[in-house]
Amino acid sequence: NISSNTITLLHGKGDGAFSIRDEYFVGPSPHLVRINDLNNDGINDLVIPIFGRNFTTILFGDENGSFVNRTILFSGDTPSDVAIDDIDMDGNKDLVVSHFDVNYITVFIGNGNGSFVKKENIDVHGGQHSLLIKDINFDGKLDIVGSLFYDDKIFSLFGSGNGSFYTLNTCNVGKLPSTIALDDFNYDGLYDIAVVCEFDNVISILSGNDDFTFSFGANFIAGNRPAALISADINNDGKIDIA
């Protein structure tokens, strides 16, 4: 809720309906919400990049479905997205934060108790909109894929398995790429990328190459100023769809 600087939680009733609306203050201009267990207590926590400031808010969940403890992670200017996974393979969740108006992403290593230590800023040569963490080169180590909003590119970084990343690769797409999805759209065993290009009103598909880079494949008309997408087998025909 950008105007009220809050997020809203609706509790599911199990029949498709929702009740009990809870609101939590998180900071100016919250951008999105990510969910994961950050402190290894078996309960999901919330991570919210605060686009209007230089921090990310973390709300820790309790056994009642509430979020009672709030902490601030100073994550750098205009945080736009947070990707969560165990990038250093120590069993604890780590964070990678993208920044809309600066040229680097920020890596935070988790201690397993909900606290994080900044490891490094990685220059990706442009402000970013969104991030995903996935093992795109199938070496058992997690990699990063993201969109460079103002530079009209997608970037990828290979992970070393210790929280570090190497070999920045980029691929040109349409204007103002924002949300991305990773999937094997052509069933060749390699990850491909779908990305919303807001200015061009298209979804661009990038095909995965044998060297685990990406090349432009095709554009599909998506309507006026598309802003987000997901990929899944929506109609259960065994083929990946995009919405």
Each model region followed by its residue ranges:
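Blade-edge motifs of beta-propeller repeat domains
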Residues: 11-28, 60-77, 109-126, 158-175, ...
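Glycine-aliphatic tripeptides that mark coil-to-beta-strand junctions in extracellular
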Residues: 42-44, 91-93, 140-142, 189-191, ...
